[in-house]
């Protein structure tokens, strides 16, 4: 999801780039003594520990928004927060491979009861935390119960009634209702030590994962080193230094040769940097717009002490929502806004095994106009459709600090003008966008490695059902998906929730969203560094790229 903590991509002119580059170069140089490059052979952070050979370390520039405010605490949001990734410092029960198939990490085996309400995991008996204490099933139960009970936790374990250790190596997870998407959550929830967890854990984490946190200079960098007591294969990359920089500063650091990998966006994709190549990693980092399906002025949505207006008198008309989906030129949007670095998006999980092929739509502006005109809409002298005195005029809100969303909003407005729908883009801070989330159009960013997003966006009581869609048939499919005995068996039900041949959220159905593009995650990568094959990256341009950093190598 993309909300207040969303990492923004700054609009930078070429003139601004020169000034920003100078500042960024100074910042990068300031860190050079602390983080050496893999091919330059410079000394790595002396204060972080013993010297590490240059062929076994990397320095990565990430956006400033990727520095975890609460530290490296899975019971808050490390690994399992808004932008999911593997926690590196901590172990997880299971993990996923590049094809999103589950693999054991701490788990030796697991099974679900016949009623799908109890998951039983047997874990390894040879795992130790970095302080030398053994990791047992009690630590697993403690972690899950802590997350379930904490108001700070971002991982959703509300379906868990209780986790119970029945022995040192067996833990039972009791559910309030069947929820087989639990495995996707467990794949990013790091296990913390019951004996050492408390205030300050995020700054001084004790874990059992591939890496140890050796140094954290807040606002600047974090250094990880390989865990010598790790139970799995020893990491090939023994030291990982992550420096936090704005995008223009990251490019300056690349030009100065101070980092080995650096995030960037389509804004800078046409740059050429000697000694580096631009890598584009596919993602499910989608951009799309929610379209309220109900008339304005309906029941308000209450969240805490806030009450949000709902409904929209233009998008409440299904022919408008369907016409918008038909008229969008996704290819042009990707070329104009992303410089070609993206793929067309039709749903929240394109490319995932649970995605429905029926979500795809072929552009047809003529058919879109016919839909509107058959429903009684007629173009006025201004070229905008109107009916019963109401013009097809919409305001589209986007995060003012995000140049890509701004450009995408403007492109969408231009395309809708061709159709005959007036769209006025309006940038605002996230706190000013939220009041419109159930009644207006917002340019959202979504996408995770879990089908749970489909549930939250489409279920009648889903926490992110901004469109206000409510359909008992769709709800039943979603409930059935979660109640299946294994993940693979759930795929057809996720797909039917989107379109079963007669109804669903698909463009030919309720058309609750219009999706534009899955944004490629772009990185400058130093020549000679082989970044291991990436699985589809979720929303959030940052930590997911280092999910498999332990298997990177220098050629």
Predicted ranges, named:
Residues 108-151, 172, 253, 313-314:
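Aromatic- and charge-enriched surface segment that lines or borders ligand/interaction sites
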Residues 111, 118, 122, 153-196:
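Surface-exposed binding/hinge segments that line
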Residues 61-114, 206:
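N-terminal lobe/hinge region of extracytoplasmic solute-binding protein
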Residues 378-448:
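Ligand/substrate-recognition segments at binding pockets and active sites
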Residues 2-3, 19-31, 217, 289, ...:
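Detector for C-terminal structural segments
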């Amino acid at each position: 999801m993309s909300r207040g903590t969303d990492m923004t991509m700054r609009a930078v002119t070429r003139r601004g780039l020169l000034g920003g580059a100078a500042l960024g170069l100074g910042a990068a140089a300031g860190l050079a003594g602390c983080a050496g490059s893999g091919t330059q052979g410079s000394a790595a952070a002396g204060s972080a520990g013993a010297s590490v050979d240059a062929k076994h370390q990397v320095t990565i520039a990430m956006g400033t928004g990727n520095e975890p405010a609460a530290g490296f605490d899975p019971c808050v949001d490390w690994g399992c927060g808004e932008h999911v990734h593997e926690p590196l410092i901590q172990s997880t029960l299971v993990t996923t491979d590049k094809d999103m198939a589950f693999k054991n990490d701490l788990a030796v085996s697991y099974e679900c009861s016949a009623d799908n309400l109890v998951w039983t995991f047997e874990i390894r008996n040879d795992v130790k935390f970095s302080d030398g204490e053994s990791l047992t099933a009690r630590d697993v139960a403690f972690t899950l119960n802590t997350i379930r009970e904490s108001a700070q936790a971002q991982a959703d374990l509300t379906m868990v009634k209780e986790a119970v250790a029945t022995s040192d190596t067996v833990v039972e997870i009791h559910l309030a209702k069947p929820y087989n998407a639990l495995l996707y959550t467990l794949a990013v929830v790091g296990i913390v030590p019951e004996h050492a967890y408390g205030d300050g854990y995020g700054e001084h984490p004790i874990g059992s994962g591939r890496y140890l946190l050796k140094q954290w200079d807040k606002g600047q960098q974090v250094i990880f080193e390989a865990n010598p007591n790790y139970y799995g294969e020893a990491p090939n990359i023994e030291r990982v230094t992550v420096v936090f920089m704005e995008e223009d500063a990251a490019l300056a650091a690349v030009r100065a040769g101070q980092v080995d990998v650096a995030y960037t966006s389509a804004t800078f994709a046409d740059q050429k940097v000697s000694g580096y190549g631009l890598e584009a990693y596919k993602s499910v980092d989608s951009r799309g717009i929610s379209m309220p399906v109900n008339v304005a002025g309906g029941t308000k949505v209450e969240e805490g002490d806030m009450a949000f207006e709902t409904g929209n008198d233009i998008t409440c008309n299904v022919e408008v929502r369907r016409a918008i989906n038909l008229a969008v030129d996704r290819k042009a949007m990707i070329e104009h806004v992303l410089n070609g670095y993206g793929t067309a998006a039709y749903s929240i999980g394109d490319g995932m095994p649970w995605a429905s092929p029926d979500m795809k739509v072929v552009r047809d502006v003529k058919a879109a106009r016919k839909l509107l005109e058959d429903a009684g809409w007629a173009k006025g002298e201004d070229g905008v459709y109107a009916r019963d005195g109401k013009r097809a005029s919409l305001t589209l809100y986007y995060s003012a600090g995000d140049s890509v969303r701004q450009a995408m909003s403007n492109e969408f407005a231009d395309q809708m003008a061709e159709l005959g729908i007036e769209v006025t883009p309006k940038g605002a801070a996230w706190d000013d966008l939220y009041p419109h989330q159930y009644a207006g159009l917002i340019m959202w960013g979504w996408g995770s490695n879990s089908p749970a997003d489909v549930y939250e966006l489409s279920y009648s009581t889903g926490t992110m059902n901004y469109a206000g869609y409510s359909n008992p048939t769709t709800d039943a499919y979603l409930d059935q998906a979660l109640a299946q005995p294994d993940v693979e068996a759930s795929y057809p039900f996720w797909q039917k929730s989107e379109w079963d041949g007669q109804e669903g959220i698909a463009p030919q159905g309720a058309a609750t969203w219009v999706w534009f593009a899955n944004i490629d995650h772009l990185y400058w990568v130093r020549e000679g560094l082989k970044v291991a094959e990436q699985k589809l990256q979720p929303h959030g341009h940052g930590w997911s790229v280092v999910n498999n950093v332990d298997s990177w190598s220098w050629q």
